[in-house]
Amino acid sequence: MSLRVSMRAFSLSSRVCARSGSKFSFGDLSKVKLRAPIIPTHKNFDVSPDHPLWAFFPEGNNTETALRSGDELDMNSREWTFAELRRKSFEDLHKLWYLTLKERNILAREVRLAESLRYSRTQQHDALDEKLVTVQKRIKQVLLERQVAHERVQTFTQQQQQYLTEFEERYLNASEHEIVSFNEKLVRLQYAFFGIEPQLQDYDLEDINIKFVEGLSFVANLKVKRYLKQNPAQEQEFELPLNGVVEELPFLLRNVTEAIEEVKALRQSGESVKLDKIDVFPFLRSALSNAIEQEELDQ
């Protein structure tokens, strides 16, 4: 339908032009100047030096040849070992993966170009690509190991938290003749779960980490809860929770009664402050160092 309409319109316009008597003619063609033909060549194209496709060439926009020979390839290189990759951070593995992928893309482009040129000497390109494939497989294996380890830690953390909850309940409900045994278990627990040494002189101040802080909080609050349960009258005078490591540390260094009095004194003097995270480790190292020195002097 539309095709026939357009043909009629064209036919009418032709008739109108013919009836008008207008004549169209070219001028003197001898005066028309023709430019010399432009021979197609890559020099006629201005390619940006930052063009993303330069990434498919080994030297970027400084690459002198589109296809390297086998002698130009680095065949003396070796694959990254598992031991080397396991020491790398996630960021380093990410970078290494994409550097390897980039080199494989460069080799793949050269091999495809060689095939189009019927050039068959690409065995060394393939051999180098196999090394890169091996590196990528090893990176994936290392990441898989980390994922499995993380999942196991998560499972262990859940089991650990369940055990701590059950231990806390048994500790708080222990009778007077049972509490001695539970205190011994608490010492073993704080070392096994949090790395808190039983003896003050055995502390390595450089080993103080987030697990140590978590263990300190668990032990201190557990002892306070037990004390307040045994001394209900103190509940109105002593509020929980403890205000960070400043109030928790005394329960690791002294018996519960002395620690309670020390925390009360800190609160009354206004010295009980919640430290910023960046100040927690330095405070603990300094306080424990002073406590160790004092213990050595007392001996």
From Swiss-Prot:
Q: Name one GO biological process term.
A: mitochondrial translation
| A GO term for molecular function | structural constituent of ribosome
- Please indicate which superkingdom the organism of origin belongs to: Eukaryota
Q: Where in the cell is it found?
A: Mitochondrion
User: What keywords are annotated for this sequence in UniProt?
Assistant: Mitochondrion, Ribonucleoprotein, Ribosomal protein, Transit peptide
- A Gene Ontology CC term for this entry? mitochondrial large ribosomal subunit
InterPro entries linked to this entry:
MRP-L47_sf (IPR038340), Ribosomal_uL29_mit (IPR010729)
Pfam families xref list: MRP-L47
Main subcellular location of this protein, as a coarse class: mitochondrion
Please state which protein family the record places this protein in. Answer: Belongs to the universal ribosomal protein uL29 family.
PANTHER family per UniProt:
LARGE RIBOSOMAL SUBUNIT PROTEIN UL29M, RIBOSOMAL PROTEIN L47, MITOCHONDRIAL-RELATED
Subunit-level organization: Component of the mitochondrial large ribosomal subunit. Mature mitochondrial ribosomes consist of a small (37S) and a large (54S) subunit. The 37S subunit contains at least 33 different proteins and 1 molecule of RNA (15S). The 54S subunit contains at least 45 different proteins and 1 molecule of RNA (21S).
Protein's name according to its UniProt entry: Large ribosomal subunit protein uL29m
